[in-house]
Each structure stands twice: as C-alpha cells, then as structure tokens.
Amino acid sequence: MIRFNNDYNHGAHPEILKALQETNTESYGGYSRDPWCEKAREAIRQHLNGADVDIHFMIGGTQVNAIALSAFLRPYQSIISATNGHINLHEAGAIEHTGHKIVALPAVNGKLTADLIAAEAQAYHDSGCPEYMTEPKLVFLSSPSEYGTTYTKAELEGIRQVCDQYGLYLYLDGARLGYWLSASDCDVTLADLARLTDAFYIGGTKCGCLMGEALVIVNPELRHGFWTATKQSGGVLAKGWLLGLQFYTLFKDDLYFSITRQADELATQIETAFVNAGLSMYTKNTTNQKFVILSNEQAEYLGKSYIFEFDHKVDDEHICVRFCTSWSTETTEVQQLVKDICIMK
C-alpha cells in the first residue's frame, strides 16, 4: 500500500538523520540553550529581514498552539477561528482545556476574511454588555488551511489592518508552512509573516523533521515569561539541541523550501490526473493537500492500492477524500497513482 493519507508518515529527511548521527556522541547543555538552537535561530532570522523576534522550539503543533495561546491571553479573552480551524476541530479541546473560548466563524474557502473578523469584533463592542462576554483578543489562522487553501499577502494585510483597528493579536499556525511558502502562486515570505503577525510557528513535523516546531514571537508584549509558561506546561524538551539541529539543517541551505516545493509539484500532478479524468476537486489550491470527490466505487478501487483520508460524505454515492504528498513522497508513487486514476472507471 502507498500512503497519501498525510504528510507525517515517514521518519525524517536523510540530511537530518545524518546530522543527528554525526553529532550523537557530542554533549550539550539542555533546554534549547545550546549552540545548535542558536544556529537554528540565526538561520531562521536570516529569512526575517532582521526582525526582532524570540524563537522557541517545541515538539508538536497542538502543544505549540495550546501553550502559546494560553500564555498570550488573559483568562477572560477568546480566540477567533474558522469553523474548520485545527484548534476548533482536531485538537481534542486543548484550547478550551486552558479555559479559553473559541469563537468559530464560517470559513470562506477554508479561510477567515477581514470582513468576518471585523464583524465579530464590532459585534462585541456593540453588544451593550461586553463585560458579560469573553473578549475577542486573538485571531487564529492556518496557512495552508485545513483544505489546502492559502492566504495572499493582500488578504493578510487586510486582516492585519482589522486586528490593529480592534486591538487583536494575529497568530498563524504554520504546521504546513513550507508547503505554502514554496507554492507556485505564493506571494508571502517569512519576512512578511514577521511583519504582519504577532506570532507564528514554522512547522517541522510535517516538513522533514522527526518532530519539532519553531514558534516565532514577534510582538514584544507576548514574550515576557513565555519560556517559564512553556516549562510549566511541559513543553520544554531537556535535549533541546535535537530540535535546534533539525531546524538548522532545514534552514542553513534552504532545504526546507526545496523539499516542500517538490511535494507541491507532485500534488499538482495528482490533481491534474483527477481533473483530466473528469472528477471534481473540492478546493482549488497549489499546496500538498488535494481534496477530490469520488464515487463510492472509485474510492473502493483506489483504496485497494493506496491509503488516503476520508473527509466527508457528499451524498449517498459520493465522498470527499484527501490525497496528501510530503517531502518524502516518491515520484514513482505518484506516477503509479496517476496511472491508476487514468484507468479508473
């Protein structure tokens, strides 16, 4: 069976394994206070046009989101998210467990819009009794979204303007950040994110690392005490250099971008095959997640050779499924899938 169900079904990129092996007999100080974490921070900062930021390394995305958002907010403040936002659907109530309400707004093509955010923020101010309500304070975005769609620079600038107008923090979940920044139509850079967000994280788990995410805190208001809050929540890895070394390997020669770009290109080949076969795509995007509408029979046929992910039932005869490529996807695997799509009834 060939796996197209997600982008974290392999270990790590060979260059990362090589770096880990070569340094395995060396000893370092703990808790991300080591040369490799410093090198990784510097390599990332090289892409931020000199922005003054703090960078913290953690294990996984849900951990980053739960720790960061709880640290950034007062107990009575809430988070604006798309209904299909990862924190709203797929983090087992991690945010709510910290005591914060998620205000879920209907997504437009998988994304929030500046108008939706402004309307929600204005409704709070117009309520007549805001002191009886949670205060919307942070906007949560994912790019790519849960449906592979991405934000343009203009969309982010519009959302930033609304956040400034209403005093909201802007936070971006970057679990699949590489697949967005490497997409053929992406006009956003890491430097733009450092300019437009208050905090964002650079995903490693889904982009070549064994595990690991790099949280970039831009807004100075959000930095004080963050390391201690992370430790209190169990998010500080004693052997922190294992994370720093991985991110340094990904960013020292832009490996992060080349391996995710290849995944995007392979995903486009899959999408093209589905479209040429007369099938409908649920969303249009240029990243590594492709959502297609299949008949039950077509899904059963492809399911004999490939593992892919069910998304939702369309009707009694059709379902929407996700095919996902990654840094580890082989060209031959995609070629075989394309061949089977072409002969599929």
Please tell me what each predicted stretch does.
Residues 53-73, 103-110:
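Conserved core of the PLP fold type I
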Residues 71-89, 118:
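Conserved PLP-anchoring active-site segment centered on the Schiff-base-forming lysine
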Residues 74-76, 268-343:
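Conserved C-terminal alpha-helix-loop-beta "cap" of PLP-dependent enzymes
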Residues 99-144, 151-158:
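PLP-dependent aminotransferase-class I/II
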